[in-house]
């Protein structure tokens, strides 16, 4: 069984145990905060938008530096992040909906709930906890599930980041006409990363959609390798959690976009 399959089985177990129902009962409702739309930054900013991630660990990185997460979010906003991503998976990524609930209150930026969503109730919990964006991973959803969950989120005034890794997944994503697609440079089955993977998939980009490069971005040089693919933004976690000079590092990633679309 791959790590991804293991994670999905775990999510199904949580659904059976009414884990998400309990979260809806105990979380403070923070779902109606007015925030700028991520799509506006992606469409109108002349530099790459950065979704800055709060991350404690992952299957590929067992432990990241301990940070004051409240200060980390404030610094992300201070140094130019366009959105905040907060992992809510407890077992594999060390996150929680309580963390999302707490941190979403201290920022006016768009907030992404980063999780493995397979059911509508997870979207309900994400919104209640304070998310304004949810992640849908094409690899773990059927076409019907993808369409249903996407529509459900949009109808609940959430933005959706639709994540793909292969050309086939990109084709499936394009069928629902999303506004934002994320190209994951990490193979979720093997957890191997290649930042140049973005360039391969962006050859098939459509003009009515914005594209974000996710995973494997550790340096300004990594961004320079992919900026000419006409990406609109980046999702960066590990490198931002590790750096001791956030004031210099985060702005250095916001390269000027290649505005000459092919």
Swiss-Prot record:
Keywords from the named record: Amino-acid biosynthesis, Aromatic amino acid biosynthesis, Decarboxylase, Lyase, Tryptophan biosynthesis
One GO term of the biological process aspect: L-tryptophan biosynthetic process
Matching CDD domains: IGPS (cd00331)
Catalytic activity of the protein: 1-(2-carboxyphenylamino)-1-deoxy-D-ribulose 5-phosphate + H(+) = (1S,2R)-1-C-(indol-3-yl)glycerol 3-phosphate + CO2 + H2O
Single annotated GO MF: indole-3-glycerol-phosphate synthase activity
EC class of the enzyme, as a word: lyase
UniProt-listed PROSITE patterns: IGPS
Keyword Amino-acid biosynthesis: yes
Enzyme Commission number: 4.1.1.48
Top-level lineage group: Bacteria
InterPro entries linked to this entry: Aldolase_TIM, Indole-3-glycerol_P_synth, Indole-3-glycerol_P_synth_dom, Indole-3-GlycerolPSynthase_CS, RibuloseP-bd_barrel
Pathway the protein contributes to: Amino-acid biosynthesis; L-tryptophan biosynthesis; L-tryptophan from chorismate: step 4/5
One Pfam family, short name: IGPS
Keyword Translocase: no
Family: Belongs to the TrpC family.
HAMAP family per record: IGPS_B
Annotated protein name in UniProt: Indole-3-glycerol phosphate synthase
Originating organism: Staphylococcus epidermidis (strain ATCC 12228 / FDA PCI 1200)
């Amino acid at each position: 069984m791959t790590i991804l399959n293991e994670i999905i089985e775990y999510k199904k177990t949580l659904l059976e145990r009414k884990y998400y129902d309990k979260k809806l009962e105990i979380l403070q409702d923070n779902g109606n905060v007015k925030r700028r739309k991520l799509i506006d930054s992606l469409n109108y900013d002349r530099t790459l938008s950065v979704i800055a991630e709060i991350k404690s660990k992952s299957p590929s990185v067992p432990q990241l530096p301990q940070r004051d997460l409240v200060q980390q979010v404030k610094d992300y906003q201070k140094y130019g992040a366009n959105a905040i991503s907060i992992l809510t998976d407890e077992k594999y990524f060390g996150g929680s909906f309580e963390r999302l609930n707490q941190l979403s209150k201290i920022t006016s930026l768009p907030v992404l709930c980063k999780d493995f969503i397979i059911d509508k109730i997870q979207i309900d919990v994400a919104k209640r906890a304070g998310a304004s964006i949810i992640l849908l991973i094409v690899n773990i959803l059927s076409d019907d599930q993808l369409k249903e969950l996407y529509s459900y989120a949009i109808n609940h005034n959430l933005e959706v980041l639709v994540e793909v890794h292969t050309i086939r997944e990109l084709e499936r994503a394009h069928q629902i006409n999303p506004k934002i697609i994320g190209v994951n440079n990490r193979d979720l089955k093997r957890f191997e990363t290649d930042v140049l993977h973005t360039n391969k998939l962006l050859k098939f980009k459509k003009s009515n959609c914005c594209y974000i490069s996710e995973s494997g971005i550790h340096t300004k040089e990594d961004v320079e390798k992919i900026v000419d693919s006409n990406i609109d933004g980046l999702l960066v976690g590990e490198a931002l959690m590790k750096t001791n000079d956030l004031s210099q590092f985060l702005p250095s990633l916001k390269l000027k976009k290649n505005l000459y679309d092919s």
